[in-house]
Amino acid sequence: DTDDDGDGVADTFESSADNLDVSYADYRVSSQYDQSCVLSDGSVTCFGIDDQGEISPPTLSSPVRFLSMGGYHGCAIADSDQAITCWGENASARTPSGTGYYELAAGGYHTCGINASGVSCAGTNDYGQTTTPTLTKPVQVAAGTHHSCALDANGVTCWGRNDSGQSTVPSLTNPKMIAVGANHSCAVDDTGVVCWGDNASNKATPPALTNIRQLGLGSHHSCAITDSGVNCWGDDAYSQTSSIPSLVNPVQISLGNSLTCALTDQGVVCWGYSGDARTSVPSSLSIDPDRDGVTNQGGVDAFPFDASETTDTDSDGIGNNADTDDDGDGVTDASDDLPLSASDYIDTDGDGTGNLMDTDDDGDGT
């Protein structure tokens, strides 16, 4: 894998860059219910509906290593001790104790994390969702509204509420990845995506998919990233499954009630319900892996991994600083009066309007 932590930044780049770490994701988006938070360049930015303070994270000690949004709370693994910090509704009661965490999942009313001791959960336990069963070398944990799942050396185990079958794991062949929605669960195994639990709107009926790289489940829909891009299924009341925008190399996906967000080469993109702020990614969000001061959010930086370049006027793959013909009109910049406009190259009077459009080429007023 050339991107072990799945943050969209190649391992080779992270190994040589300042303040980037190949051992954990430097960039991550996490959505739940009606809000999302983004881990970016060591800080957490949140947006959406702030019912219980869930989009108002406290100041987190660096480095922030992991981020997960729950029903009305959010959590992160932060500081050098790798402890879990939560905020929002009943945050302290939903914060697993201990240090050394490297994986985290916030559910509806509980939170689970993985450290060297295994899986630890905290929060509401009305269905046994925080009573962790015996697990062997767990590598991933996921949390729904009232149930939890883990992937360990023996496969997938789920516990907690099971009224829709969300904790009854079917037969799986070499499972590699898990994800949990409000009351349904999915895994990626050798056959593709396998789902179980509540199947309203066919959210637990995945299409045939291959080469699955990432999986995300929401309350009413599900999505997966494959080599061909993002595929979604389930409820489409707000076009969250059918109107997938154009995405440049999506690497991570996260879902809420009626929203979907993806981390791409051009930053975070969200879609679905647009009647409030839940899909409105803040313009202030900074994603700047090459630390050149130009964000890649929205594709502003055409060269997010090259601090010496930010702009490519003619889209030829060569940055303007190195390109001898920025606008690609066949006239070198040294001889082009309008090096950033391919429509003309002569501007006799230097007024910024090329002679082809200028009604007074020499600027003499006539």
Regions found by a protein language model. Give the residues of each.
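An edge-strand/N-cap motif at the start of beta-rich repeat modules
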Residues: 3, 7-51, 57, 65-66, ...
